[in-house]
UniProtKB/Swiss-Prot annotation:
GO terms for biological process: translation. InterPro entries: Ribosomal_uL14, Ribosomal_uL14_bac-type, Ribosomal_uL14_CS, Ribosomal_uL14_sf. GO terms for molecular function: large ribosomal subunit rRNA binding; structural constituent of ribosome. Binds to 23S rRNA. Forms part of two intersubunit bridges in the 70S ribosome. PANTHER family: 50S/60S RIBOSOMAL PROTEIN L14/L23, LARGE RIBOSOMAL SUBUNIT PROTEIN UL14M. Pfam families: Ribosomal_L14 (PF00238). This is Large ribosomal subunit protein uL14. The keyword DNA-binding does not apply. It comes from Pelodictyon phaeoclathratiforme (strain DSM 5477 / BU-1). Belongs to the universal ribosomal protein uL14 family. The gene is rplN. GO terms for cellular component: cytosolic large ribosomal subunit. Part of the 50S ribosomal subunit. Forms a cluster with proteins L3 and L19. In the 70S ribosome, L14 and L19 interact and together make contacts with the 16S rRNA in bridges B5 and B8. PROSITE patterns: RIBOSOMAL_L14.
Length: 122
């Protein structure tokens, strides 16, 4: 469950290291985001010379979430950290590499580029 003011780790090589959620897409009253949901983030820490800089506002998709998520088969998936991948305006990843595992729910949400770049899909 990601909400406004949640701090997240960036799981790609776009240059950002830590971001903070400032908006959850999905209507006025939408409070929480889960695996595969898009959010707007503000970059809080970045590496020098990266694609994105500190204070940049970007779109992102949640790829790992600490709060467990129930699947259709009755199993649950949970991760050790909250992580996102930064997106451009077309919904494609800004980085060229993805670090760490990503959830299978991204395939259902049509984020095929992220799924293909990820080293492991759980």
């Amino acid at each position: 469950m990601i909400q406004k003011e949640t701090n997240l780790v960036v799981a790609d090589n776009s240059g950002a290291k830590k971001v903070r959620c400032i908006h959850v897409f999905g209507g006025t009253g939408r409070r929480y985001a889960s695996l595969g949901d898009q959010i707007i983030v503000s970059v809080k820490a970045a590496v020098p010379g990266g694609i994105v800089k500190k204070k940049d506002v970007c779109r992102a998709v949640v790829v790992r979430c600490v709060k467990e998520s129930r699947r259709k088969d009755g199993s649950y998936i949970r991760f050790d950290e909250n992580a996102v991948v930064l997106l451009n305006a077309q919904g494609e990843p800004r980085g060229t590499r993805i670090f760490g595992p990503v959830a299978r729910e991204l395939r259902d949400r049509k984020f095929m580029k992220i799924v293909s770049l990820a080293p492991e899909v759980l």
